[in-house]
Amino acid sequence: MTNRWKTAVLAAALAVAFGAEATAPKTDLMGYTAGADVISVPVTDGRIDVVSGVVYRQIKSARRVDQLLMTVLQPRTNGLKPAIVYFPGGGFSSADHEKFIEMRMALAKAGFVVAAVQYRVVPTKFPALIEDAKGAVRYLKAHAAEYGIDPERIGVLGDSAGGYVAEMMAATNGEKGWDTGDWLNVSSDIAAAVSFYGISDLTTIGEGLNQDKVHSSPAVTEALLVNGAAFGNFAGAPITADRKKAMAASPLGHLDGTEPPVLLMHGSADTLVSPMQSKHFYDALKAKKTDVSYVLVEGAHHGDDPWFQKPVIDRVVTWFKAKLGGEKPVAGKTADKGANL
């Protein structure tokens, strides 16, 4: 057997071993010309439609109307899907809802409708941001058919200040008095919540950290959120000035055992929001017999690179799948595969 023949036999054997066909290019394909590479692409991923600039809430004042926006990632499938509402972090001073595309796209590819939302920040006081968060959930439930959402399977996800919002959504699930604005005929209750390095107690954000003393200032954002800015005869007040008021604005102040499943994740090296925030919330939820999981990420800081890695993202996707389930088929409905090319 010549070396050339041996090489051909070996190539054919390898092709069979790896499931490939040792065939010549299909020269009869329309568009083929000598030298063209002909490949066959298996379809393993569906398409995701992006709907941006969605106005989910309007805040009217004496001189203007502020519009709060959401961006929706919508898998192009025909069934009823669970949904995730993402609340971005920003230290209570910003809410850039276009962040964390890595996590949002992973969830969308896994079959979730993902809505990333703006919410009001300082100098607007509490409870505005929670009213906005609940308004976003109500909006999605009211428009569930439009986005292919199962309204009974909506979860929330947030990081940092957004984690605080997610925790508040879980802690106040079923509580009355938070819903304002439109779509008041539907519930703002959620079915699951994930918090990344969130805040459960506004009075102890820096617990155990060298920077803890900064939180005694009336100018830190949690103090501005709850007590407001200095103005006129009001000189401002630290977050601990009225502990009852502060706890009414904290997730730990609302637990009653009716919370939905919760996943908490925190970095052990976080120096902005103490890891003790998640520890205390986990312990309190366990004491209430809530379905709660806690993941401490060794060496991770606040919003640094580990949070964007596959093991973290996969853990969240898997957890949401376990708690909310997958897509449910709708009889007689087919997706428009050619829409929005």
Language model features with spans:
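N-terminal cap/lid segment of alpha/beta-hydrolase-fold proteins
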Residues: K26-N78
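Mobile cap/lid helix-loop segments that gate and shape the active-site cleft of serine hydrolases
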Residues: V43-G46, G208-H254, A287
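Catalytic nucleophile-loop/oxyanion-hole region of alpha/beta-hydrolase
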Residues: A95-M103, A115-P151, P306-V312
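Histidine-bearing beta->alpha loop at or near hydrolase active sites
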Residues: V121, V297-D304
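Conserved alpha/beta-hydrolase "acid-adjacent" motif
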Residues: T271-Q277
